[in-house]
Structures are given as C-alpha cells and as structure tokens.
Amino acid sequence: MALRYHIFAGTNAQARHLASIMCMEPGEWRYVHSEEGLIGLRGGVVLCYGTWKDFPDKDKVLTRAKINEMHILEVS
C-alpha cells in the first residue's frame, strides 16, 4: 500500500485514532507532529486532527510546507 495520507496531530495516539476512524491500512498513512514534517511534501493529503482554527501558526505551516491539498478535520 502506498503512502497517501500525512496525519498532523499532537500525538501518535491521535493519529492512530484518526486512521482507525477512516479505515486506513497500515502503510497508507504516517504521523506528523510538527510543521517540519510537512515541509517539502509533493503528494498525498494532509489530515489535521484537532481544532485547526486554534493552531497559532497555521498560515506559516501552510506557506512553508507548500502543501498540495489539505483537509481540516476536527475529531474528538
């Protein structure tokens, strides 16, 4: 299975929870805990776990990462 999703979350447990909810297969996603992990992505979809509107550096992250596609999800 090819890597398709980058889950931007506070903890690995949150990333695993989101992957489970979305029925993702192992190898289809990876956990990203900081903006440095997003920089340079060329493909795939970034999924955010949590409340993106409360993330203070969201504009900086998007600009530096040059993300192709981003879906903002609020999962509790």
What are these regions (language model features)?
Residues 1-76:
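Short, flexible loop motifs at catalytic/binding sites
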